[in-house]
């Protein structure tokens, strides 16, 4: 049986698409290989959100070109955001790649089976793409140019997929989109994310629902209320701010101010005092001075996030920022600001997790990791526990006995649902 190998970088949507493509290859008669050298087909699922990620993709492709020179029968497939909407440009740049198709698309060199392409034994926590694309065109972001405009799937279609995943063993779904808060705006009935959450909530056997990524300007009170009142919806929200300075936010074309963002957070915390918030932050955006960075730092400290995904700005081709704004913050200064935020996160999250010592939590166990069961709380905290019992897929009650900024150690109290 011929082998296939997947190399994936980037967001959870990329991982979800790679999982689906892997299942498709298996339907075509391939089996998963341990490494590229053992495969007849290698798929590269690419990301170009940051320059560092794009460089990794290009380096990987050149390594595969060398492998193909040694094994001319090897077929290389490329998808993801490196491809974008103009495949001809990629074909010219990487002529040794055999198959190229855009992000979110399916390969066209063989027949595609009808219906959902799902794993026979899906993970406990399964990714489900509910929409593609983005209409916001933030000045630094290449995603709208690569994945196109927003396109939502219907509630009925998503519901059928989730129900089938649950039937096959999943207990949680993570709803994915570049901007899930805009879900449904392009559909005839104009449903919203809150409507989708309500529909999925009724699926028997589904224990939890998560979603990402959100845009602060698009979060409605209806969504906040749905999260607060639907028990299966996790108390976890990704709320990317990108900057804490109003001038920089305007240059980014984010559509809100520091104060408006703070007011949104206050509304969310009022409705859900136990909410776990995560954010994305860019340091060193064009023209960002020390005072503007300090506004970001202060916002991070004031909100007290459970996770801060921070990155140094890098210009992306096609974007307004790359075309019209000078990348004028020195690299050494970007690195300094990056470290300050990382240190703040370690301190803030460390204190928040330490406050959980000797408390109880409900954990959905996802599987084994280094001989320990691994799962997450309703707020998304990573928890490890030891037990000889088969706990995969179980909802368990645990007691926290050790904490760190990155995870919690717990003891099993009892199994709540198996």
Curated annotation (Swiss-Prot):
Keyword S-adenosyl-L-methionine (UniProt): yes
Source organism (scientific name): Dehalococcoides mccartyi (strain ATCC BAA-2100 / JCM 16839 / KCTC 5957 / BAV1)
Keyword match Iron-sulfur: yes
Cellular localization per UniProt: Cytoplasm
Catalytic reactions of this protein: N(6)-dimethylallyladenosine(37) in tRNA + (sulfur carrier)-SH + AH2 + 2 S-adenosyl-L-methionine = 2-methylsulfanyl-N(6)-dimethylallyladenosine(37) in tRNA + (sulfur carrier)-H + 5'-deoxyadenosine + L-methionine + A + S-adenosyl-L-homocysteine + 2 H(+)
MF (Gene Ontology): 4 iron, 4 sulfur cluster binding; metal ion binding; N6-isopentenyladenosine methylthiotransferase activity
Keywords for this protein: 4Fe-4S, Cytoplasm, Iron, Iron-sulfur, Metal-binding, S-adenosyl-L-methionine, Transferase, tRNA processing
Annotated SMART domains: Elp3
Residues covered by the MTTase N-terminal domain: 2-118
Domain Radical SAM core, chain residue ranges per copy: 120-351
CDD domains per record: Radical_SAM
The protein's name in its UniProt record: tRNA-2-methylthio-N(6)-dimethylallyladenosine synthase
NCBIfam families documented for this protein: MiaB/RimO family radical SAM methylthiotransferase (TIGR00089), PRK14336.1 (NF010916)
GO cellular component: cytosol
């Amino acid at each position: 049986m011929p082998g296939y190998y997947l190399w994936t970088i980037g967001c959870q949507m990329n991982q979800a698409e790679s999982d689906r493509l892997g299942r498709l290859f298996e339907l075509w008669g391939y089996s998963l290989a341990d490494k590229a050298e053992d495969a007849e087909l290698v798929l590269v699922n690419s990301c170009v959100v940051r320059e560092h990620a794009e460089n990794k993709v290009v380096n990987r492709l050149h390594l595969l070109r060398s492998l193909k020179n040694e094994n001319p029968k090897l077929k290389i497939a490329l998808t993801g955001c490196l491809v974008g909407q103009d495949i001809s440009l990629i074909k010219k740049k990487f002529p040794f790649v055999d198959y190229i198709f855009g992000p979110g698309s399916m390969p066209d060199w063989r027949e595609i089976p009808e219906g959902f392409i799902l794993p026979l034994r899906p993970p406990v926590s399964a990714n489900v793409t509910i929409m593609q694309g983005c209409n916001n065109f933030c000045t630094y972001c290449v995603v709208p140019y690569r994945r196109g405009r927003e396109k939502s799937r219907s509630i009925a279609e998503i519901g059928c997929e989730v129900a089938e995943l649950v039937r096959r063993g999943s207990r949680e779904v993570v709803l994915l989109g570049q901007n899930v808060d805009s879900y449904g705006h392009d559909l005839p009935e104009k449903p919203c994310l809150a409507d989708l959450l309500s529909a999925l909530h009724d699926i028997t056997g589904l224990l939890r629902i998560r979603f990402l990524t959100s845009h602060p300007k698009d979060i409605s009170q209806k969504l906040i209320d749905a999260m607060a009142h639907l028990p299966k919806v996790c108390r976890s929200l990704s709320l990317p701010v990108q900057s804490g300075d109003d001038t920089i936010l305007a240059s980014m074309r984010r559509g809100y101010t520091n104060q408006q963002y703070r007011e949104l957070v206050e509304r969310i915390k009022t409705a859900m005092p136990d909410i776990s918030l995560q954010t994305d932050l860019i340091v060193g955006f064009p023209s960002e001075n020390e005072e503007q960075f300090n506004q970001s730092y202060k916002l991070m400290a004031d909100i007290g996030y459970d996770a801060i995904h921070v990155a140094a700005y890098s210009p992306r081709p096609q974007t307004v920022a790359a075309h019209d704004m000078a990348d004028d913050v020195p690299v050494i200064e970007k690195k300094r600001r990056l470290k300050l935020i990382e240190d703040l996160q370690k301190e803030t999250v460390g204190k928040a997790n330490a406050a959980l010592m000797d408390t109880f939590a409900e954990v959905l166990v996802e599987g084994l990791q280094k001989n320990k069961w691994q799962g997450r709380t309703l707020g998304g905290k990573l928890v490890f526990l030891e037990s000889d019992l088969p706990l995969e897929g179980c909802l368990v009650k645990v007691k926290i006995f050790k904490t760190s900024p990155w995870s919690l150690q717990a003891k099993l109290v009892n199994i709540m649902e198996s």
